[in-house]
Regions:
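RNA-contacting regions in translation and RNA-metabolism proteins
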Residues: 1-176
């Protein structure tokens, strides 16, 4: 099993390095031992045949001026991750949970979302009024939901459709 994961990791690393080379971006691809805990590796498997989702293949791309790989609100990073998953899945004939990060961007972004969630939860608690956050992608909404899941005074729910979907933070007293 360990040698199989090593082989899959090398395939993924090779694909990512080749894509970066084709984009003429000089960067180092560093394998990370385990995926960030709030990353969702079990997204819908494009090939329908999921590998063991407990063994996430994770990389941090390091170098100078890599903002272009992150893009606006991490959209380019999400797209690059998706493309790598598709290519590797095609080569390995199985969907593999692959997580990419650029210079720790996701970690910083997740910490920022968690801080926002707690700040807004305290505001909702004090004002006893629901508060709708700005629309955000599913993986960002998930972080907010997980951050506030055990909050004693508020609960969360998603509302809206498509790109307008957002998290609403609601005082728990409204549910009593």
């Amino acid at each position: 099993m360990a040698t199989e994961k090593r082989k899959e990791t090398e395939i993924a690393r090779s694909v990512l390095e080749k894509l970066l080379d084709l984009m003429e971006i000089k960067a180092n691809v560093v394998p990370v031992e385990e995926a960030p805990p709030d990353e969702s590796p079990d997204e819908e498997a494009p090939l329908g045949n999921a590998a063991d989702t407990t063994s996430v293949i994770s990389f941090d791309v390091q170098g100078d001026d890599l903002g272009i790989l992150i893009g606006r609100r991490g959209q380019t990073l999400a797209s690059l991750q998706y493309i790598v998953r598709l290519i590797v899945g095609h080569q390995a004939q199985v969907w593999l949970p692959i997580v990419l990060d650029i210079e720790g961007y996701k970690k910083r972004h997740n910490e920022s979302l968690q801080a926002l969630a707690w700040r807004m939860a305290e505001q909702v608690k004090a004002q006893r009024m629901p508060f709708a956050l700005e629309p955000m992608p599913a993986f960002d909404r998930r972080i907010v939901h997980l951050t506030l899941a055990n909050h004693p005074d508020v609960t969360t729910q998603s509302s809206g459709e498509g790109e307008s979907r957002r998290v609403v933070i609601i005082p728990k007293e409204q549910f009593r």
